[in-house]
């Protein structure tokens, strides 16, 4: 994987392609980039997920706050959730597991709280639970095809030493057009 990095006094950025993070490379700072035009998908005390519109299109960004003692200690020694997500996503793609393409991760260093950001492709998809409830499984090839694909994916995942930890219908996305299953929420 061809990666580039960009370091400032405030953050370290590792990326594949400059488009989604061009504002950071242009010295806009983390806050203006993350607070750009966006849609909040999930907001909590430790994690926030957004669809962020960038000059190269919409991307999915998950912001991890290292607030607790353990997370702060791990951040202090250089272990960040976004970096782990980036590496796991790339490794899973390498073994044929469909996951959103990882684009970048950013590690921000602040006195009050270290945080990290995972950036990946935004999917044109809906979650499997919604598909099953609203349109039925026949709309995506039927139950047999679905369970065959899910089981084969989980075999590849487990065969490579990975466990999802939260495998549920809502963590499988079904792409629009030619329906394909994509596994999400890998953390």
Show the residue positions of the predicted features:
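Conserved ATP-binding subdomain of kinase catalytic cores across diverse folds
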Residues: 26-128, 149, 155, 159-160
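AlphaC helix of the protein kinase catalytic domain
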Residues: 128-138
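Catalytic-loop of the protein kinase fold
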Residues: 159-169
């Amino acid at each position: 994987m061809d990666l580039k990095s960009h370091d400032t006094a405030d953050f370290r950025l590792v990326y594949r392609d400059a488009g989604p993070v061009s504002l950071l490379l242009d010295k806009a700072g983390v806050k203006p980039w993350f607070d750009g035009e966006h849609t909040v998908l999930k907001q909590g005390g430790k994690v926030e997920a957004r669809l962020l519109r960038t000059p190269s299109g919409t991307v999915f960004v998950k912001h991890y706050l290292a607030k607790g003692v353990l997370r702060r200690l791990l951040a202090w020694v250089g272990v960040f959730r976004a970096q782990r997500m980036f590496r796991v996503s790339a490794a899973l793609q390498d073994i044929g597991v469909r996951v959103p393409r990882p684009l970048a991760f950013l590690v921000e260093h602040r006195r009050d709280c270290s945080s990290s950001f995972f950036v990946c492709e935004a999917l044109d998809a809906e979650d499997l639970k919604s598909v099953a409830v609203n349109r039925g499984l026949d709309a995506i090839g039927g139950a047999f095809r679905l369970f065959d694909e899910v089981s084969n994916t989980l075999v590849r995942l487990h065969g490579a030493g990975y466990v999802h930890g939260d495998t549920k219908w809502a963590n499988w996305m079904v792409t629009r057009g030619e329906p394909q299953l994509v596994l999400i929420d890998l953390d």
